[in-house]
Curated annotation (Swiss-Prot):
Species classification: Eukaryota, Metazoa, Chordata, Craniata, Vertebrata
The protein's role, per its UniProt record: May play an important role in spermatogenesis and/or testis development.
Keywords: Developmental protein, Differentiation, Phosphoprotein, Spermatogenesis
Native source organism of the sequence: Homo sapiens
GO biological process terms held by the UniProt record: cell differentiation; male gonad development; spermatogenesis
Residue numbers of Phosphoserine PTMs: S114
Residue ranges of the region described as Disordered: 1-90, 104-134
Tissue: Highly expressed in testis.
A Pfam family this chain is assigned to: MEA1
Protein name: Male-enhanced antigen 1
Listed Acidic residues bias regions: 50-60, 112-121
């Protein structure tokens, strides 16, 4: 018995359970009866686990107890692809929900979609420079920002040399130039 074995003597194996053609993530592998009884020798058809490349006999897939079949997991994360079920396929969605419940997981309900939120979101995406606010909120923001002062080391020298009126003129010209030029999206 070498370092390739678990303390119990059973070989360590990772696999993907394939049920009806659907591939799931790493799942528990149900031990066979000899492993449950604490049999120390290797089981028929199983090899020692090691970090080396899998042998040909380990790559073969076969049917196990209760119709389960085993498929080795992909060890290269860059090649891993996730297939998403089509939104309209109710059977697949129901199957996924059943699996989530069987695993004891709870996912929060999706937020309710509202037409008002969609319109506001579309408007905000089209016009990045404005946030819809009522006049009272605008005044509150102005009063709050008027009270903000930056520490002297935080203000660059060029900003100390320009007056507020000159700065407003620079900002207005920049805004007009941005509105006149085509968007670079």
């Amino acid at each position: 018995m070498g370092p390739e074995r678990h303390l119990s003597g059973a070989p360590a194996r990772m696999a993907t359970v394939v049920l009806g053609g659907d591939t799931m993530g790493p799942e528990r592998i149900f031990p066979n009866q000899t492993e449950e009884l604490g049999h120390q020798g290797p089981s028929e058809g199983t090899g020692d686990w090691s970090s080396e490349e899998p042998e040909e006999e380990q790559e073969e897939t076969g049917s196990g107890p209760a119709g389960y079949s085993y498929q080795p997991l992909n060890q290269d994360p860059e090649q891993e692809e996730v297939e998403l079920a089509p939104v309209g396929d109710g059977d697949v969605v129901a199957d996924i929900q059943d699996r989530i419940q069987a695993l004891g997981l709870h996912l929060p309900d999706p937020p309710l979609e509202s037409e008002d939120e969609d319109e506001e979101g579309a408007t905000a995406l089209n016009n990045h420079s404005s946030i819809p606010m009522d006049p009272e909120h605008v005044e509150l923001v102005k009063r709050t920002m008027a009270g903000v002062s930056l520490p002297a080391p935080g203000v660059p020298a060029w900003a100390r040399e320009i007056s507020d009126a000159q700065w407003e003129d620079v900002v207005q010209k920049a805004l007009q130039a941005r509105q006149a030029s085509p968007a670079w999206k």
